[in-house]
Amino acid sequence: MDRRVFISSIAGGLLTVPVAAGAQQAGRPPRIGWLSAGSQPDPFLEGFREGLRRLGYVEGQTIAFEIRHAQGSLEALLAGAAELAQSNVVLIVASLTAVRAARALKDIPILFTISGDPVEAGLVRSLSRPGGNLTGITFLSLEVAGKRVEFLKQALPRLRTLAALSNTDHPGEKSELRATETAAQALGINLIYVAFSQSPFGASPELGKALERIRRAQPDAMVVFPEGATMANRLDLANFGIAQRLPSIFGWSEYADAGGLMSYGASQRDTHARLAIYADKILKGAKPGDLPIEQPTKFELVINLKTAKALGLTIPPSLLQRADQVIE
């Protein structure tokens, strides 16, 4: 599906929905809507719940949830957003794709997590003062992009050519590419930029074509930019790296769990737990537009030794000592 068609479908699907949120019934705990394009079990929802528990909330007593998982269906996502609009939720929590389905609900505060740039995505006016009814956390960190290249170089001292797999539909993709290029140049590495376009819903042949271009180029290693499309295809990407004997680094631990050699980035579960702090502030009267977009400051390096063995690669002890988690 074309990106513009996707966004217009979302807008059209919600323009006719009357908003009935905000009128919380007396004696009932405030209800938070959780809108996800994915499926259950949902570790990010569990992270958010954990964050609320740390703040003293008790589900069913001082807080309640209305949960909608779209299972990868645009129609289900639109229906879920419409249902939440009618369910007296005082707040909606959503990822980027789901936010695009819910953003027409101007009267309901919306908290989001996004792997890219929320300003470039058109969600907020600025990181410091988002404005409107949205705020949240971005995973995008250009410093982290450079560190991924450095970690690959430590694992592969003879690294000379590096493929960078990137989704051009991802907001902030160009900034992440520039940071990766800068790090590669500083280390004497030739970067091969391989782009594909993946809409939030529906299969796309472009990712397979991009992987075929990487196979033909025969780079020494691969860096995969973290976002929704590569996350959804993380198992295929990990298997590709193993089959091609191509050491690869990814953005989140879920990629390494799926068989990727390494990952470096913020913990998604911990970040969703931090999102509960913003939920608490909004429940206590803060306006989303006054809460600055947060960027993670803590990152974790995960190394999959099973994959290293399959690749015939020995990870240096110094890099293993640096790892926050080693999968054996």
Q: PLM ranges: what are they?
A:
Residues 1-328:
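Short hydrophobic alpha-helices and adjacent helix-cap/hinge residues
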